[in-house]
């Protein structure tokens, strides 16, 4: 299964990685991206792992960071809708 990101999810990923890099050092920004990539690899291998959340979307929390991958399953595609902070309300 392949993964793709919405424009919004890509922006959220970059913004969060930049925030960690600026406030805690570049290594943490890179660690955030690596954790996101690890989560995508797990989800591509096991797409039903995340529980259903808000209709047809699914939610999978990152291990080391307070973010969740919000995604939808399409035919042979895992589409990332958002990268949501777990303590903020979605807009």
Regions found by a protein language model. Give the residues of each.
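Basic, Lys/Arg-enriched alpha-helical interface segments
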Residues: 1-57, 74-77
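Short Gly/Pro-enriched turn/cap motifs at secondary-structure boundaries
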Residues: 59-61
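A short, glycine/Asx- and small/polar-enriched loop/turn
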Residues: 63-65
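Enriched for short, Lys/Arg-rich terminal
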Residues: 67-68, 72-91
């Amino acid at each position: 299964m392949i993964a793709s990101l919405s424009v919004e999810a890509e922006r959220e990923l970059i913004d969060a990685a930049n925030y960690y890099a600026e406030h805690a050092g570049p290594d943490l920004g890179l660690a955030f991206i690596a954790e996101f990539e690890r989560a995508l690899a797990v989800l591509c291998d096991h797409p039903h792992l995340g529980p259903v959340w808000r209709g047809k979307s699914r939610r999978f929390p990152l291990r080391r960071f307070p973010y969740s991958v919000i995604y939808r399953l399409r035919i042979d595609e895992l589409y990332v809708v958002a990268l949501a902070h777990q303590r903020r309300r979605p807009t």
